Each structure stands twice: as C-alpha cells, then as structure tokens.
A protein has these predicted regions:
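Conserved N-terminal segment of class I S-adenosyl-L-methionine
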Residues: 1-98
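A short acidic, Gly/Pro-enriched loop at the edge of an enzyme's catalytic core
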Residues: 97-109
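A short glycine-rich, Lys/Arg-flanked "PGG" loop and its adjoining helix->strand segment in the class I
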Residues: 122-137
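Short N-terminal helix/helix-N-cap motif within the alpha/beta-hydrolase-1
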Residues: 119-123, 148
C-alpha cells in the first residue's frame, strides 16, 4: 500500500532536476522539512535498521552522500563517509573498496543505496569484513534499478 503524505503540484516551468546530484543542495532541501513524502521515504529506508544496532555500538555508513541516516539512526556513534569531500562527512574521499580505516573498527556498517554503485562487489565485501569487529553487522539496503525505481527517483528528486 502506498501512503501519500502530501500531494505536491509542480509548475510547468519548474526544473525539477536542477539540483540532481548536488549533495549540499539536497541536504539543505531536506532540512527545510518541506517535502513530507521525501521524509517518509527516507524514514522507511533507515528506521528498520535501528533494530540491529545497540545503543553503544560504533557505526559507519559508507556512501552516505548527504548523510540522511544521521536523522533516523538512533545511535549517536554513527560516522558517515563518502567518496566525496563534503564538509558534513566524518570521513571524506573514502573508497569503499579500500577505506584505509583500522581493522575491527566498527560494530556495524550501513550501505544504503550503495551496492548498485560498487564496481567490484567482492572487494567491497572483503573490505567491510576487514573493518567490522568480530560479530559485526553489515546492514544493506538497496532498491531495484528497474524503470519504476528510476521514475520514482525523478519524481522524488532523490535517489
């Protein structure tokens, strides 16, 4: 069942893709709180992960982009990383295939909407295993790259 939180009407002249890929603008837009549908989608994306995370766990999100996870993950020991160098990141210019982080550093690692961007998945999984502590958790959330998902991405202005 799809729940529409708020129906949005767009003007014919609005360029809905002008900030596509601009992480800083996406983060500002989200923090304004105007798009209730986006909030709903992101809440569903991240909230279920809290059931796998303990209060004092140390976590990392790889490929965090805007870092929306910090809004929904209740654990305050979550660090965010990305291949980019945006100022909101805890770890900048991190290659998920070779993070250069210490062995056994994290109780959990989140990879949300990342796997379809990873060119060498086996190398990625080996690296995640290396940086996770014994019995650590790799929490993966990824959507289908179907045409429907691509259309929804354009409509929501967010991947």
């Amino acid at each position: 069942m799809i729940k529409i939180v708020k129906k949005i009407k767009f003007s014919k002249n609005e360029n809905r893709m002008k900030d596509f890929g601009n992480i800083e603008e996406r983060l500002k837009y989200f923090r304004k709180g105007k798009n209730k549908n986006l909030y709903f989608v992101l809440k569903k994306r991240f909230e279920w992960m809290n059931g796998y995370i303990q209060k004092h766990d140390i976590g990392l999100e790889v490929g965090a982009g805007p870092g929306f996870s910090k809004e929904f993950i209740h654990n305050k020991n979550l660090k965010i990383s990305d291949f980019s160098d945006h100022e909101h990141l805890d770890y900048k210019n991190i290659d998920a295939h070779d993070t250069k982080l210490k062995n056994n550093s994290f109780d959990y690692v989140i990879a949300a909407q990342v796997l379809h961007h990873i060119p060498y998945p086996i190398k990625f999984f080996k690296e995640m295993h290396r940086i996770l502590k014994k019995d650590g958790k790799l929490i993966i959330q990824d959507a289908s790259c179907s045409i429907v998902f691509q259309i929804v991405t354009i409509i929501m202005r967010h991947e």
